[in-house]
């Protein structure tokens, strides 16, 4: 009995401790709820007299009526195709081939004659009546807007004739009607440009990467609106219109070269990577193919085109395969086309000697500038009059009327070769020059590291300068256009506000001091 009584007392004490503990926990829970630490829990009875939290039901998902099932990838097994199925392979090959054929079709040249409406991309209709009428640059580093030639250089000039020309060329100013960033002449990167020979007004043509041809009449004046109403924001754009431009598409691939013969000012010749040379009649606004390989499947991209000043019927060209061609447009195609393989690598540029067009110069990826005489040119083993090898590839070789050649090269130099002083006009067929005689007379340091997105820099002479000093222009990676004399003296560095890209494609008007520069965005700068 004593043991039972002790056990009973112990049991009573244990139960009392449990009750005290529960009371304390309940009090702490109430205090926590009153202070907002956590919300009260709904309790339910349990067999032990303790409470358990009630489990919350999962939220109901509301189905959206307009929700479409997401497409899932399906394996070949689910589609009923065996592993490495010939059917799957054939289907993939067919899809790939169809995509390739569609891409090739876009790039195949079109041999048809085009009317204006068939070529027009944007702009107004062309009217025939309106159409006639030495710097040192750190190698490979472009420093936008940093000049390397300016007024101080002009002041230090001691030669009176040179100083006068420097002042004249440096006095050219940007066309004021529109800023350059608003004159978008072509949809894509400009590769080549030329002026119409007319001195009545500046008429500019530009060819781009995708075969588009842009035309700008820079004699147009910016229209002035009538009295403008205050707070009239809707008509703001109408009061400040862009210049009137015309964009045509005569080619399917890059237009690499443009040429207007002085005796045929109404005809523009264009050469392209689509292997064709076309003639655009500016009066009739029609385009016809003048030369192309016999088969449209022949891919022979043309890199340059030129014509002799005294012969408006013969076309000369070079290709990216290293060939040189000649074609008299008056004769039948097969009998009149003559080609020579002059290089194993790309010929990037060439030009004829204007006064003696049987001489011509080529610039090649094989690092050479070569001088040729077409009177003594073998088809089997063509031998040049002479050649000069540069450290890196030569981009272009431009002849002037004085017998001088200007080249640009990836070794960051402009080289000037004076063959006029060596008597080129009197050379007989078969005349050759030694390596020493082929060395350049002048070398000018010039940054030619254009990279992937800027068109290659090429020098271009003024065909008929108004003074005895020959001059050429070339783009500057610091967003200028540089002008040099044939002796390598810098005449000007043209820039201005609103030039937001490198005017890499720079061209002179043949006789007037007008210079245009084209950028990778299809916009142009014009100095007059």
Curated annotation (Swiss-Prot):
Biological processes annotated in GO: DNA damage response; regulation of DNA damage checkpoint
Superkingdom, natural source: Eukaryota
InterPro entries per the UniProt record, alphabetical: WD40/YVTN_repeat-like_dom_sf, WD40_repeat_dom_sf, WD40_rpt, WD_repeat_DNA-damage-binding
Keywords assigned by UniProt, alphabetized: DNA damage, DNA-binding, Repeat, WD repeat
A single GO molecular function term of this UniProt record: DNA binding
Residue spans of biased composition, Acidic residues class: 230-242
Any one cellular-component term (Gene Ontology): cytoplasm
Annotated region described as Disordered, given as residue ranges: 32-98, 217-243
Ranges for the WD repeats: 185-226, 250-290, 297-337, 342-382, 389-428, 451-494, 497-528
Start-end of Basic residues biased regions: 52-62
One Pfam short name: WD40
SMART domains on file: WD40 (SM00320)
Keyword DNA damage listed: yes
Keyword Iron applies: no
Function of the molecule: DNA-binding protein that binds to both single- and double-stranded DNA. Binds preferentially to UV-damaged DNA. May be involved in DNA-metabolic processes.
Family: Belongs to the WD repeat DDB2/WDR76 family.
Name of the molecule in the record: DNA damage-binding protein cmr1
Organism from which the protein derives: Aspergillus fumigatus (strain CBS 144.89 / FGSC A1163 / CEA10) (Neosartorya fumigata)
Upper classification of the organism: Eukaryota, Fungi, Dikarya, Ascomycota, Pezizomycotina
């Amino acid at each position: 009995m004593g043991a039972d009584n002790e056990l009973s007392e112990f049991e009573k004490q244990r139960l009392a401790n449990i009750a005290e503990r529960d009371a304390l926990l309940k009090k702490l829970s109430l205090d926590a709820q009153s202070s907002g630490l956590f919300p009260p829990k709904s309790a339910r009875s349990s067999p032990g007299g303790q409470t358990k939290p009630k489990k919350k039901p999962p939220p109901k998902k509301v189905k959206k009526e307009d929700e479409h099932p997401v497409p899932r990838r399906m394996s070949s097994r689910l589609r009923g195709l065996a592993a490495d199925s010939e059917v799957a392979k054939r289907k993939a090959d067919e899809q790939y081939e169809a995509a390739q054929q569609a891409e090739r079709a876009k790039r195949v040249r079109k041999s048809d004659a085009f009317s204006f409406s068939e070529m027009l991309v944007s702009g107004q209709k062309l009217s025939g009546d309106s159409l006639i009428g030495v710097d040192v640059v750190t190698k490979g580093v472009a420093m936008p807007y940093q000049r390397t030639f300016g007024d101080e250089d002009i002041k230090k000039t001691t030669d009176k004739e040179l100083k006068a020309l420097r002042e004249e060329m440096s006095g050219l100013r940007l066309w004021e009607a529109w800023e350059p960033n608003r004159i978008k002449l072509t949809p894509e990167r400009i590769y080549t440009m030329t002026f119409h020979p007319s001195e009545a007004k500046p008429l500019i043509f530009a060819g781009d990467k995708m075969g588009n041809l842009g035309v700008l009449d820079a004699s147009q004046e910016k229209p002035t609106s009538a009295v403008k109403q205050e707070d009239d924001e809707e008509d703001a754009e109408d009061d400040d219109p862009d210049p009137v431009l015309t964009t045509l598409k005569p080619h399917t691939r890059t237009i690499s070269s443009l040429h207007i013969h002085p005796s045929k000012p109404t005809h523009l010749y264009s050469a392209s990577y689509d292997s064709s040379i076309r003639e655009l009649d500016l009066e009739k606004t029609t385009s016809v193919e003048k030369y192309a390989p016999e088969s449209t499947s022949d891919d022979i991209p043309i890199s340059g085109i030129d014509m002799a000043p005294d012969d408006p019927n013969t076309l000369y060209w070079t290709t990216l395969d290293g060939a040189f061609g000649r074609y008299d447009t008056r004769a039948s195609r097969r009998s009149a086309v003559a080609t020579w393989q002059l290089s194993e690598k790309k010929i990037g540029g060439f030009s004829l000697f204007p006064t003696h067009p049987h001489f011509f110069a080529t610039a090649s990826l094989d690092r050479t500038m070569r001088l040729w005489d077409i009177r003594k040119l073998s088809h089997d083993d063509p031998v040049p009059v002479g050649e000069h090898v540069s450290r890196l590839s030569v981009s272009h070789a431009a002849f002037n009327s004085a017998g001088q050649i200007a080249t640009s090269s990836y070794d960051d130099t402009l080289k000037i070769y004076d063959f006029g002083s060596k008597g080129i006009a009197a050379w007989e067929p078969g005349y050759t020059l030694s390596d020493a005689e082929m060395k350049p007379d002048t070398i000018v340091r010039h940054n030619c590291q254009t990279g992937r997105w800027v068109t290659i820099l090429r020098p271009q002479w003024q065909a008929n300068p108004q003074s005895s000093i020959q001059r050429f222009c070339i783009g500057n990676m610091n967003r200028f256009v540089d002008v040099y004399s044939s002796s390598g003296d810098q005449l000007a560095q043209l820039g201005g506000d609103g030039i937001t890209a490198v005017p890499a494609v720079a061209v002179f008007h043949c006789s007037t001091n007008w210079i245009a520069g084209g950028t990778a965005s299809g916009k142009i700068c014009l100095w007059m």
